[in-house]
Amino acid sequence: MNFPYYIAQKVAFSGKKSFSRLIICIATIAVALSVAIMIITTAVVRGFKNQISDKIFGLWGQIHITDASIGQSAEVTPVDMKQTFYPSLDTLRHIEHLVPNKNFLTSKSDPFTPKKTKGGIHHIQVFATKSGIIKTKAEIEGIILKGAGRDFDTTFMTKSLVEGRFIKFQDSSASRDIIISNYTANRLKIKVNDKFVIHFLDQNQQQLKRAFTVCGIYKTGLEEYDKKIAFVDLSMVQGLLGWKKNQVAGFEVFIDNIDDIEPIAEYIHNEVLPNNLYAESLRDKFKNIFEWLDLQNVNEIVIIVLMAIVAIINMITALLILILERTEMIGILKSFGTNNWTIRKIFLYHAAIIVGTGLFFGNLFGLSICYLQEKYKFIKLSETDYYLSYAPIELHLPTVLLLNLATLLLVVLFLIVPTYLITRISPVRAIRMK
């Protein structure tokens, strides 16, 4: 029989009313709330980052293939659609790449080790863009037309449509359909099936006009992009730019797993593309927004550390009160020859029972809040500030299990120090105090 654990159980579940029962109750609640907040924080941060990333990647893909001279001039250099990798690049699955070897400095192994990506490429599509100005009777608004071809993946756009339909392509001529954002529609007071004119400048700075009919209205919540982007037939953009049917601004590549974005981008650039083309990940292209998303990791860590400190302080306080209240018991055990470490283990087991109870109720509360938020979305956000209208939830079971295990081990580890007080208790004095 495990003697310390047996005594700890008897003490913990004795049912005796005392001041320490109140302190234990407070400590249990503190641990429960700390764990619940940790779980909710990790779920919200994970959901927040993934949903915003999905929106950006849904609009633009994860990797762009463009002319190598992009960024060196204001003019966009067209790329020939007839490439050896198009459209067969979407058959690329797992690729092997090299990652730094963490044990390189402590062993004689190679500095890099081979590793396979988690997924591959599931889609590739062409795109082209052209800036213009929408002019209605009431307002004027700048806009960027993004050309969508027949290879356009409509999955994200279908989910983002709040009204109307996607573009209907025509065989004989470019479609006049246009999909505008909800922001643009409200600002210009435009509805589905309304017509309006967009003004452009051609290569010779001559003014062009094109009439469009609104076929759909979308909303991503990314106001920075919703303000600017409208979707039209790719052929329309090619015509406005004076390009041939086989000329586009580039290719958008969609991958299976976001963790593979860097190795796949490097593989495409080094192994697939000719010298005149360049592959760039969206993380590099839109650094600001992804750096902002990465900052959420710092917030997550700060909250978890603070909650861990709260749990530790409350448990230390509770343990010290338990020791002081059980001074007579400690004296009796010492008088029977029980060593200090065995007695310390009794209180550590008792503390572990308290922490375990707190973990149970903390998980129950935290997971319940996550479930209710996922189902009813009762915690609302300002979409203008956060790109989302509600707090997103994405639970990750390994993370939840790790939080529970780390909290239990960390708290119990910190409680070893205050149990040192037991070694200072004299059995004679402890018994006399009673």
Q: How would you label these PLM feature ranges?
A:
Residues 1-35, 54, 434:
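N-terminal Sec/SRP start-transfer signal
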Residues 420-434:
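Short cytosolic juxtamembrane segments of multi-pass membrane proteins
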Residues 14-25, 257-313, 322-324:
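Peri-transmembrane interface segments
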Residues 21-46, 294-329, 352-361, 409-413:
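Hydrophobic alpha-helical transmembrane segments of multi-pass inner-membrane transport and secretion
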Residues 179, 188-280:
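Basic-flanked hydrophobic alpha-helices used for secretion and membrane insertion
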Residues 345, 357-403, 416-424:
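Short helix-loop junctions at transmembrane helix boundaries
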Residues 320-322, 329-374:
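Transmembrane alpha-helical interface segments in multi-pass membrane proteins
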Residues 36, 43-142, 170-171:
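Hydrophobic, regular-secondary-structure patches
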